[in-house]
């Protein structure tokens, strides 16, 4: 932080995208500095516009001294017009077929997806004489989202894939959501290393607090009739007035106080034992607009964690770990309020819980220029909630218990001074819903049932990205993001095929401070179903090209 250094960039790209960013750092005293991050983006994006404005100033003083302080602010506003969905057509075996060009926006000019995020953060670090450190952070924030989007469907619900053409009529339904949260977060943790009982200990202990006062309406559709359109006329400029009644709010407040401690004990020069414990005091209360349905949750939750690390040399380590955790987000449990008093299961259902066992290893390779990680895991989730606002009211719990077994592979770093690689892959050969009260639909479709593989759980997923310095001034790179086939959540009899999306870039250093970079995302313009839902998909981003000029001064 104690350096006068600045960076600015300008990007122009597909969809008439303009983006300017700046990162400015000023020394203001012997141990004080001011930093300012700012950005502006405007993008028509063929109708699905994405405009953003953001600024984040921060000031730090006492840097590196006994008492270090900081204060920062963050503000980001977005004005968008979303592609909410594209309708799918199914093959006889249940395969999801994409139907429309990925970049085509068939919504209305009056659609929008606007967000606002703002928060203030205060920080203090106290350094003790014995090398201990107390790090405290306090943040207050306000977050808003207001979305009114068009749901796209075929007027002829029985149309087949081969019958779709430029004149095919599309309907525009309405989907509206609005929400606001006031959030207070505080965390203070103490860390130190010391010798006790003839062993070296690295201790971390602390407390955190999270307070969320929120209001939501997840079903706030426009009542005004909406015109149809045709496949061959995307972004046709049609608009309707907002005919909705004043918003009716579901409200909730959630509080969580967490206490945690962890000790890493060096048993020998090569063997370390890690033990930790976390306690959460979680409570939340929910109420519908009329106040006729309310629900309260209150739990005291204990999460143990233990691990063993073996480091035979400086270049490798092996570990085994076991841990549990709970979901203490108030948002997760809000959909119980949508049920009637007679069917409300939320109050009687314990909170979401996860349990994870992992065995892995890490290796430093290529003269410590790269890090390789391999891990095997077994994870369980209990009382999994449905957080999809469109379906949670009818199916609040996805499963009583499910598990997944798999492996993760990671490689990051330079294989040679010129060649850089980033690779991650997750393989989940075994995943199953172990307990569920969901009944199998008469037609064999519907939501996943006990014994099924959970939705949105592909066997293979990952990405690889590699760059190579061709000369001292020219660097080129390419990579692929991929995913194998999977089912949507709530649609066990249909599936989306696997896909791979290729990105590429080339960068030229004009001098040691200025460079220009060309990025091509989705190089081969692959059309694929990225987000999967019950009855529709969100298309993956179409091919885009961006040219960025960046300079440091």
Region spans (language model):
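Face-selective signature of the C-terminal outer-membrane beta-barrel domain
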Residues: 120-142, 170-287, 373
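Outer-membrane beta-barrel translocator/receptor signature
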Residues: 1-57, 63-68, 118, 370
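C-terminal beta-signal and adjacent terminal beta-strands/loops
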Residues: 416, 473, 481-489, 507-553
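Acidic/polar loop-and-plug regions of large Gram-negative outer-membrane beta-barrel proteins
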Residues: 41-45, 58-62, 66-127, 142-181, ...
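Membrane-embedded beta-barrel scaffold of Gram-negative outer-membrane proteins
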Residues: 125-127, 133-139, 143-151, 317-319, ...
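Repeated loop/turn-to-beta-strand initiation elements of outer-membrane beta-barrel proteins
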Residues: 31-34, 66-71, 131-134, 198, ...
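Structural signature of Gram-negative outer-membrane beta-barrels, strongest in the C-terminal barrel
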Residues: 62-64, 181, 200-204, 208-210, ...
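Gram-negative outer-membrane beta-barrel transporters
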Residues: 369, 373-380, 398-490, 512, ...
């Amino acid at each position: 932080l104690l350096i006068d250094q600045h960076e600015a960039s300008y990007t122009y790209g597909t969809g008439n995208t303009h983006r300017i960013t700046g990162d400015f750092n000023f020394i203001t005293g012997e141990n004080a500095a001011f930093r300012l991050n700012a950005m502006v983006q405007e993008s028509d994006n063929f109708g699905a516009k994405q405009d953003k404005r953001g600024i984040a100033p921060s000031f730090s003083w006492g840097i590196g001294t006994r008492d270090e302080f900081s204060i920062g602010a963050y503000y980001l506003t977005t004005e968008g017009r979303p592609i909410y969905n594209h309708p799918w057509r199914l093959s006889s075996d249940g395969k999801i077929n994409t139907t429309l060009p990925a970049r085509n926006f068939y919504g209305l000019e009056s659609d929008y997806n606007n967000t606002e995020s703002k928060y203030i953060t205060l920080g203090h670090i106290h350094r003790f004489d014995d090398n201990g450190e107390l790090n405290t952070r306090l943040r207050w924030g306000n977050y808003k989202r207001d979305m009114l989007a068009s749901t796209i469907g075929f007027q002829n619900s029985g149309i087949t894939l081969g019958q779709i053409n430029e004149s095919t009529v599309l309907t525009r339904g309405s989907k509206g959501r609005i929400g606001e949260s006031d959030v207070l977060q505080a965390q203070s943790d103490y860390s130190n290393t010391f010798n006790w009982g003839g062993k070296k200990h690295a201790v971390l202990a602390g407390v955190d607090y999270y307070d969320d006062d929120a209001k939501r309406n997840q079903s706030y559709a426009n009542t005004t009739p909406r015109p149809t359109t045709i496949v061959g006329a995307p972004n046709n400029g049609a608009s309707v007035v907002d005919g909705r009644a004043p918003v009716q709010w579901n409200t909730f407040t959630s509080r969580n106080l967490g206490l945690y401690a962890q000790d890493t004990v060096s048993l020998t020069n090569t063997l370390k034992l890690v033990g930790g414990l976390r306690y959460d005091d979680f409570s939340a209360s929910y109420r519908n607009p009329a106040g006729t349905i309310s629900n309260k949750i209150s739990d005291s939750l204990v999460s143990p964690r233990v691990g063993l690390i073996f480091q035979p040399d400086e270049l490798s380590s092996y570990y085994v770990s076991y841990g549990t955790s709970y979901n203490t987000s108030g948002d997760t449990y809000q959909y119980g309020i949508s049920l009637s008093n007679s069917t409300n299961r939320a109050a009687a259902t314990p909170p979401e819980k996860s349990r994870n066992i992992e065995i892995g290893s890490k290796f430093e390779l290529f003269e410590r220029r790269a890090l390789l990680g391999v891990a095997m895991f077994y994870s369980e989730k209990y009382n999994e909630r449905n957080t999809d606002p469109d379906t949670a009211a009818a199916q609040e719990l996805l499963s009583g218990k499910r598990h997944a077994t798999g492996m993760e592979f990671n490689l990051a770093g330079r294989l040679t001074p010129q060649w850089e690689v980033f690779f991650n892959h997750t393989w989940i050969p075994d995943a199953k819903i172990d307990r569920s009260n969901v009944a199998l639909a008469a037609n064999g479709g519907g939501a996943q049932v006990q014994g099924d593989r959970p939705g949105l759980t592909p066997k293979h997923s990952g990405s690889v990205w590699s760059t190579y310095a061709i000369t001292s001034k020219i660097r080129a790179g390419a990579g692929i993001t991929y995913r194998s086939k999977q089912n949507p959540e709530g649609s066990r009899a249909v599936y989306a095929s696997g896909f791979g999306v290729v990105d590429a870039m080339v960068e030229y250093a004009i001098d040691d401070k200025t460079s220009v970079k060309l990025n091509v995302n989705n190089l081969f313009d692959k059309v694929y179903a990225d987000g999967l839902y019950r009855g529709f998909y969100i298309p993956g981003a179409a091919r885009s090209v961006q040219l960025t000029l960046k300079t440091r001064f």
